[in-house]
A protein has these predicted regions:
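Active-site core of metal-dependent hydrolases
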Residues: 1-58
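Flexible loop residues that form catalytic
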Residues: 5-6, 76, 126, 161
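A general structural signal for short secondary-structure junctions and capping/turn motifs
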Residues: 14, 111-114, 147
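A generic structural signal for nonpolar/aromatic side chains embedded in well-ordered alpha-helices
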Residues: 16, 43, 68, 144-145, ...
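Short secondary-structure transition/capping segments
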Residues: 36-38, 63-66, 135-136
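His/Asp/Glu-enriched, well-ordered alpha-helical/loop segment
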Residues: 41-130
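C-terminal cap of metal-dependent C-N hydrolases
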Residues: 117-164
Length: 164
């Protein structure tokens, strides 16, 4: 695992891909240290395995939902830096990188695959601002990811067991 890789050139990225190195993108740390914004979209297009990390030494957040949204925001900054040529991460992509991509490193399967132990949280979004129209499940998920606070988590499932 290599953290950040903000300034890896084409030769280094090719070596990272060939060696099967996992890049831990730590957007919060990169922003706090003013070290740059990783070209995550470019790395993904090159076939580099990217996951998300908090790098609490330089980052400021441990909750993965905050790491995910920070990574999406950082990718939007990268889009501006590249004159709009590099697409930013979507919420589903950020969620995948912050969950399944890292889980795979430890031998876990894809997402909510049959036979895989459940890892999930239950979110009460009742105190989130009302929308002017009914939200789809995806829109509620996206809103929850950005507005979530610890008190909104009403249940936690880990390895198929409810732990909260």
């Amino acid at each position: 695992v290599m953290a950040h890789c903000d300034h890896s050139d084409a030769r280094e990225c090719a070596a990272i891909r060939r060696a099967g190195v996992v890049v831990a993108h730590c957007a919060g740390s990169n922003i706090n240290l003013c070290s740059g914004v990783s070209p995550v979209r470019e790395m993904l297009q090159q076939g580099i395995w990217v996951t998300l990390g908090s790098d609490i030494a330089g980052g400021a957040q441990l909750p993965m939902y905050k790491v995910i949204t920070m990574s999406i925001r950082a990718s939007k900054i990268k889009r501006m830096e590249t004159d709009w040529s590099e697409d930013f991460l979507t919420v589903p992509e950020g969620y995948y990188l912050g969950t399944t991509a890292g889980h795979r490193y430890f031998g876990g399967g894809e997402g909510f695959a049959v036979g895989q132990p459940l890892h999930a949280i239950v979110v009460d979004d009742g105190d989130f601002p009302e929308s002017v129209r009914p939200l789809t499940v995806r829109e509620r998920f996206e809103r929850s990811l950005y507005m979530l606070h610890r008190h909104n988590i009403t249940a936690v499932w880990s390895h198929g067991r409810q732990v909260k």
